[in-house]
Amino acid sequence: MPTVYDFSAPLLAPLLAPLPATLLVPHLDGQPLSLGNFRGRVLLIVNTASLCGFTPQYAGLEVLHRTYRDRGFFVLGFPCNQFGGQEPGSDAGIGAFCEKNYGVTFPLFTKVDVNGPNAHPLFRFLKEEKPGIFGMFGAGAIRWNFTKFLISRKGKVIARYGPAKVPKAIAPAIERLLREE
């Protein structure tokens, strides 16, 4: 699959809406967490699954998280069961799986829908800001597990990456955003 570069991101960044800081996301322990807790941080928001061909990306996501967290970067993982039923487990089971198999320390949240009428408001926002190409759920829909959204310190959705984009390939963009004030 060829790499597609989005040269418009730096030009459009001032026009993009910031991530809603008041939006609550359900942490894996069941407690709601405000996105405002991540204000001023660079984020990589990912819909994840435990039984997917892309599941080994958890390891690469964890490497990114550990490499850059002291500089203000976080990976946020949102399990999703909408693609082939590849995340059938309970929230506790998902957390245990990720910790045991991939040493995941980045924040994981409860299972959410990313498409359709029950899509979590966070993913509705992300798709509005960075619509993808037409997929099985319609224009702008997330096509599969491990779709990634890169968010600047100012809360702007800078880039959207498909599942085949391995985490280490996103490192230069993360570095660039971490250098910006």
Question: Where are the predicted features?
Answer:
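Structural signal for short hydrophobic segments within the conserved structured cores
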Residues: 23, 107, 158-159
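A generic structural signal for short coil/turn motifs at secondary-structure boundaries
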Residues: 52-53, 83-86, 160
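Extracytoplasmic electron-transfer domains, predominantly the class I c-type cytochrome c fold
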Residues: 93-101, 124
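N-terminal "domain-start" segment that seeds a small globular fold
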Residues: 1-36, 56, 121
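Thiol-/selenol-based redox modules, centered on thioredoxin-like
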Residues: 121-124, 128-181
